[in-house]
Amino acid sequence: MTLKEKIDSFPFWYHKIDIGGEVTPGWAPLNADNYNIPDDLTGKRVLDVGAWDGYWTFEALKRGASQVVAIDDWSDMPYAKDAMITKKDYEKRTEWDTFDFCKSHLGYTDDQCQRYTMSVYDVEKLGMFDVVFFFGALYHCRYPLLALDKLSAVCKEEIYVETAVCDDYSAYTKTIGFGYGNMGNVVMEFYPTDELGYCPTNWWSPTMQCLRTMLASAGFNEIEIWKFMEPKVVAQCRGFAKGKK
């Protein structure tokens, strides 16, 4: 079986990962440069929360990280009404199957690259980290501020966050341009069922200013925030934040 055939044998890919010249058929990240991750992570111990197929885990290792610990609790359900996979196909996958496949082909050792099925609320079991990645996961947390508190407690240097934001879009108006960001509002929109993206694991989306104040409340300083872009579609309504300890 060729490498491409092996890649295609998996029922679902979330990330686009280059392994040996073949790129896995996911869709994320939409633009990796927008995350503003340091080019040099030499010697850093990194935590990747919500790792999925492992794009950011392997990217940190490429940039010199001495060890990356990836966690996911697999609570997200990409077979929501607007997703590109059925529930039947999603349930065919095995936890960490695509991650382990990529890790093997990229040649990383167990010491360099560890992964655990774990809630973000339990990260203290893993020790301290220089850098934390928290991408595409905040809005899946029922208790988002608690999640940031937990991550702050294990972060020695920097955290990078990417999340859905409601500055330019409300799931209740369903129109781009009708959000909460124009007045710098510090608000968070709550989704009790599947209002955002028809996905029942999407609980919240903050405004950019709310994201900033949440990081500050969790103990981070020198916080920077930036949008993914001026959105034209809902998938582009994303925001980033960086905080230091």
Describe the residue ranges of each PLM region:
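Conserved SAM-binding loop of SAM-dependent methyltransferases across substrates and taxa
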Residues: 53-65
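S-adenosyl-L-methionine-dependent methyltransferase catalytic module, highlighting the catalytic core
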Residues: 120-125, 129, 142-244
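Conserved class I S-adenosyl-L-methionine
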Residues: 44-52
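N-terminal, positively charged/glycine-rich alpha-helical extensions of SAM-dependent methyltransferases
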Residues: 1-19
